Amino acid sequence: MRPLPRTLSAELSNDELSSLINIIREKSFKGKHLEIGTAAGGTLCCMMKAFEDSDRPPFVVIDPMTYFQDQLNIIRKNLQDNGVSPDGIDFRVMKSNEAFIRAKQDRESFDFIFIDGAHKVNYVTDDLRWGRLLRKGGILCLHDTNVKGVGLAADRFLRNNPHYVTEKYVDTLLVLCKTKESKNPEISLIDRAWASTLAPLLRLEVFTNKLLKKRNGKFPKNKFHTPL
């Protein structure tokens, strides 16, 4: 756990943040907006400020709050310092997988989902399960697709779910629209088994690259992720 956050601002490039806010304003959804992984709440501040106070839809945040010390209180203060009241936000301090099971049991639905949590392929795959609770016509955003675990999970998700179409792809921000409901879950047991099997292999690759960097003074060239 870090002692302090790296930044209180949104951890997106200027172009990514601009595109995210534009799509939120363009759609102007009235249903629940979900953020999975909030860090210090910088992106959350920006998303909430895209709405007037009187027109702001419900916001839900899923995060175990173990990224740095006193994370939840730092998030709340960051929101207040940016003129946004944290009191109306539904903070669910738990892992994404646990929160999904509860939300599914409660038959919740969402208009907008922004995923920027842990970047390991198994965690991203679990986060993408939330697409099951996204309404038809809703938007799902996935950040940091240049990270191998995120990119591989995104590739597989898109291959298996053609009813999700790309609306925008800015830098490492992938914006998808759910065009119809599906009889089958977006993420199957096979998908989760694939991700769980792949995760330790990717960790080994990272470890090996670090050893090579230490030996050679630089990282070896790494190919862009390819679908598995």
Question: Which residues are covered by each model-predicted region?
Answer:
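S-adenosylmethionine/decaboxylated-SAM
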Residues: 3-10, 17-228
